[in-house]
A protein has these predicted regions:
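Divalent-metal-activated hydrolytic enzyme cores
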Residues: 77, 81-99, 103, 135-210
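Short, positively charged and aromatic/hydrophobic N-terminal segments
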Residues: 7-9
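N-terminal beta-loop-helix "entrance" segment that forms/cooperates
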Residues: 59-74
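Short N-terminal binding/cap micro-motifs at the start of the first secondary-structure element
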Residues: 25-33
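Helix-loop elements that line ligand-binding/catalytic pockets
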Residues: 182-256
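Short catalytic helix/loop segments, enriched in acidic residues and glycine
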Residues: 34-52
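Short, hydrophobic/glycine-enriched beta-strand segments
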Residues: 17-24
Length: 285
């Protein structure tokens, strides 16, 4: 373990532990007995992280294969319903999600990748069906909603969004930053260490959200006026929120033609305006 300006940092980090929808690793747990293996997650990122696979529908005992399920009703509080049998699974999934989220909270996760469009795991824009009219893409999977409510600081993304280079880079950056924050807190946070952590991440914060960087700096400066626990909790929430803001690359103007060199002037020459005007010849009387 090393110390930089009071900031505790490990020499070699253990593999980062992330939760993931099990089907994305190739596990045949989908309703049709298939999977949605994602090569980047399973092969590329998988070499550097420890995955914790979860399939809430299988853990609920729905079996493989199983009857399709979907969200219905109010997007803010949808019901989870089996399509053919019309079995209402809302309460059962809510109980499972709460229990599973508590288990995951004890596993020291630093990120989570969810399956897009899933009625249980979708992070956003999940179809919510209604009695009349087309389905609306305004829902969140029941398990995903509970997970994000229980672990609000946890970096969470969907595999579909991770195909975008900028979103992928942002997620990985947030995962590593959150891991550093959790490590700093676990090592024992003090006011000097909080100040050192902020100093080490100030440039990163400023690139994402200059306003948040200033607010966090003020929070650190005034940390002695309040309880350390409250200061650490508020800083952690602000730190994670600031990194969710996308960095907008600065557009550089194309270089124009070089300016012409300034005319060299003799050191003895005087400005034309300072030269005396020539005398006019006097006329004869």
């Amino acid at each position: 373990m090393t110390r930089r300006r009071g900031y505790v940092q490990t020499e070699a980090m253990a593999p980062l532990r992330l939760g993931i929808s099990a089907c994305l690793l190739g596990q045949a747990v989908r309703y049709d007995g298939g999977h949605k293996r994602d090569p980047f997650l399973a092969e590329t990122l998988g070499r550097f992280v420890e995955w914790v696979p979860v399939c809430p529908e299988v853990e609920l005992g729905l079996g493989i294969p199983r009857e399709p399920i979907r969200l219905e009703g109010d997007p803010a509080a949808p019901r989870l319903v089996a399509v053919k049998s019309r079995r209402d699974l809302t309460r059962a999934m809510a109980r499972l999600a709460r229990a599973r989220a508590e288990q995951l909270a004890r596993l020291d996760l630093v990120g989570y990748v969810l399956k897009a469009d899933s009625p249980s795991c979708g992070m956003e824009r999940v179809r919510v069906h209604r009695d009349r009219g087309p389905a609306r893409r305004r829902g969140t999977g029941l398990f995903a909603r509970t997970l994000m409510e229980r672990l609000p600081l946890l970096p969470v993304e969907e595999e579909g969004r991770l195909r975008d280079d900028a979103l992928r880079a942002s997620f990985i950056e947030r995962v590593f930053a959150y891991a550093r924050w959790k490590g700093a807190v676990a090592a024992g946070m003090t006011r000097p260490r909080l100040a050192a952590f902020h100093a080490a991440h100030e440039a990163l914060l400023r690139a994402h959200d200059p306003g948040a960087c200033r607010r966090l700096g003020a929070l650190v400066a005034n940390a002695g006026k309040r309880s350390l626990r409250a200061a650490v909790a508020d800083y952690g929430a602000g730190f994670v929120a600031a990194l969710r803001t996308q960095v907008v690359p600065t557009r550089r103007r194309a270089p124009g033609p070089p300016a012409p060199p300034a005319a060299r002037r003799s050191p003895t020459a005087r400005p034309a305006a300072s030269r005396p005007a020539p005398r006019r010849p006097r006329s004869s009387p």
